[in-house]
């Protein structure tokens, strides 16, 4: 069983730092470790099906009890810790890595995602979970959408129902957030306090200078579809602005609107919308309308400042409020200089899910954390007001979207929640696969060679195929 679980945990290894992240306040980039990839390939080649395909996974052998004295939480940054510290009733902070809930000690194990360190640490600890001392067992851990199924489709995560959470408890959560962490047997294996629908975030000063006004309707008319977006990029370029900081800014918008999967019947598939991103990006790079820097690089974030001369970014609430340097008085965000509009297409980006670990002896505490931080409407509203997060609770978001007193300082006091609420209902995960993270990252990495003129499209495509099949040797193309 351990070997089969190892295969499941290692089969979705990563290759680069293109995932969401911004220091200590939002999800951080994750990258592949070569040794992990090699281990996955070796194990997958010699082992039978992962537990998700086993009868045992369907029925579940859930080792969840109460009475534990230490609650171990594994995560990759401070975001969830701050939510628990600030909003969970009865939590007392002791120091940076310890707290208490009643007579239960809370221990935070925070490992940054850089170079896949978080997942590597989590995998190693989960593999030893059955033999670990009670006070050392993982009780609760976090996952992101791009690799959630890696953990959800194993017996290391327990259904939330086994912890005590009911269908009625999660009835007001957005469906896509439940789809992300539903296993192959239809069991809900996690919950999230946030939703991550995205918008186009634009530089108000640039809009006023180039488009004549910075209001929502004026800007939306200039970016209403990709043809119009491209035409506006030329106008912005003539005025000295890049339309986006990098080609990768728009990638999530295109990849979230595909009509086919990355892998179809075991073969790698390039969706027409992914190819459309390539074509638009190449046009913009050649025209000097965007750059080729990696997300989270210094060149990418230069546009957070007026002298960076970037018109727009694409992102959800966490990008706007936690990643655009709002704490730096010289930034556009600190001056309330950004606006928001729907852009050419709706999309989502990121999100963090809370999973209960099989073997926890703090089931009641794990369940109550899930219940309070993801289903309590009053606490959800508190999070919106205090943290400008988009929360995973329909009544809370509908109320806040209609609240004329609410505004986001980064967006000049604008209330973007009606846009987020409209966008979240359109999120479609029907084309999600276990291979998405690796394919998304490898494709962007390979196409950078094409955009920069170091390879033809066909040569870059070969680089992509080589990289993906090294990670997933079972795939063809």
Residue ranges of predicted features:
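C-terminal motif of bacterial Sec signal peptides marking the signal peptidase cleavage site
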Residues: 17-21
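Conserved N-terminal structural module of periplasmic/extracytoplasmic solute-binding proteins
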Residues: 23-149, 365, 445, 455-459, ...
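Hinge/lid segment of periplasmic solute-binding proteins
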Residues: 53-62, 116-119, 130, 134, ...
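Extracytoplasmic/periplasmic substrate-recognition and gating elements
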Residues: 69, 102, 127, 287, ...
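Periplasmic solute-binding protein
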Residues: 145-161, 175-218, 230, 246-266, ...
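Short, solvent-exposed loop/beta-turn-alpha elements that line the ligand-binding surface or hinge
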Residues: 161-173, 209, 217-223, 259-277, ...
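Glycine-centered hinge/linker elements that transmit conformational signals in sensory
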Residues: 228-237, 265-298, 337
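Mature extracytoplasmic/periplasmic domains
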Residues: 321, 352-437, 476-477
